[in-house]
């Protein structure tokens, strides 16, 4: 039997040209931010998604050490009800 149409060969799907990305800089390393305490909710919100999840390192650009400290600080703020565990979802 022969295949009709497609001869069995697949063309590689190109994702397009790769753009050089700007390296992310850890704001705590350069002194822009300081992990002061759990009460600085405005600073902690930068590292929480719209749904209330802690953002990963690849999105925040933090070092592993600072990511762990931020995660612990966010968890303390959640326990004290300064940050919500989840955001309310609005269904349409």
Swiss-Prot record:
Segments of this protein annotated with the region Disordered: 1-28
Compositionally biased intervals (Basic residues): 12-22
Pfam families named in the record: Ribosomal_S18 (PF01084)
Annotated signal peptide: none
Family label: Belongs to the bacterial ribosomal protein bS18 family.
Family matches, as NCBIfam families: S18
SUBUNIT field: Part of the 30S ribosomal subunit. Forms a tight heterodimer with protein bS6.
Name of the protein described by the UniProt record: Small ribosomal subunit protein bS18
Biological source species: Deinococcus radiodurans (strain ATCC 13939 / DSM 20539 / JCM 16871 / CCUG 27074 / LMG 4051 / NBRC 15346 / NCIMB 9279 / VKM B-1422 / R1)
Organism taxonomic ancestry: Bacteria, Thermotogati, Deinococcota, Deinococci, Deinococcales
């Amino acid at each position: 039997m022969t295949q009709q149409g497609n001869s069995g060969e697949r063309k590689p799907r190109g994702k397009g040209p790769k753009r050089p990305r700007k390296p992310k800089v850890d704001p705590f390393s350069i002194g822009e931010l300081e992990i002061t305490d759990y009460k600085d909710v405005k600073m902690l919100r930068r590292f929480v998604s719209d749904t209330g999840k802690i953002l990963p390192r690849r999105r925040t650009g933090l070092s592993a050490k600072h990511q762990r400290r931020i995660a612990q600080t966010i968890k303390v703020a959640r326990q004290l009800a300064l940050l919500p565990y989840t955001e309310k979802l609005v269904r349409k």
